[in-house]
Amino acid sequence: MYFCTHKHQKKFTMKKFLFLTLAATVFASCSKDKTEEPVNNDIPASYYELSADGLTLVKWTNTSTTSLDMQADSKLQKVNTIKANAFRNTKLQSINLPVNLKEIGDYAFINSSISTVTFNSASNITFGEAAFQNTNITSIKLPNTKEIANSLFMGCYKLKEVQFGKVERIGDNAFNTCTALTQINLDNTGLIEIGESAFASCEKAEKAILPETIRIIGAKAFSGCFVLSNITVKAFLEVPTLKRANAFISGSSIKRKIYVPSTRVNDYKNAPNWSTWKDEITAIIE
């Protein structure tokens, strides 16, 4: 009798053990599936308008958006073009741009609240005119581009620092009235031309470095830069064309030095329009 009872209890215990083990396995499997299930954090499609092929952001329509990560969104990360006026007058404060981005249209962010812009593209980006004019950007690291468009950052009063990528031309008024900018370092950028009034009225800029590749400096390029006392021009194969002598007029009594390659000092001093600044021109200190 005892043997039968003991055998029955052992059988019951084994069944209970198998049941609990199976239940635990099923629970763990469900939990794992739930954990691994992808979470869709995409921005509601009603917040924006895309082109039919999904490659152009035509317009941002949500008026309350302040932060946007386009690269983190499965649809917006495919965008390669931001159309003209897309974020104009919006409350957007920060944006992380997609890796595929190739073009930003005219006035795309003009008069918006944007203060932080992050570029992720490895390819050159084409900028439209005045795309970031009158915004709150404080510092920016620019991607490689053929040209920094006319008036691109004009009136960005809070812009203190710019890190330039490769660029061939800086357009007219590109940084005009960026009154917080403290220095302009264009060394090793491959820059060929600076447009008219490109850095005019950058009132706090104390130093500017122009690369060996510079060939043309436009009229009033650095005019109204009251404290710009140190300008280095590294071009030595030929003296760059200075379109007007007023390129460096400060509007103040600041004592300014223009440093040029030691072997070309006299060439600079005697070149058209440069001769106006012959007393300020001196050799680069090695």
Over which residues does each language-model region extend?
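A short, structured beta-strand/loop element
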Residues: 55-60
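Bacterial Sec-dependent N-terminal signal peptides
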Residues: 1-52
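A structural signal for leucine-rich repeat
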Residues: 245-251, 272
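Extracellular interaction modules
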Residues: 274-277
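Consensus positions within tandem repeat domains that build extended binding/scaffold surfaces
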Residues: 84-85, 105-108, 129-131, 149-152, ...
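Structural signature of tandem-repeat unit edges
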Residues: 46-52, 63-81, 90-103, 112-126, ...
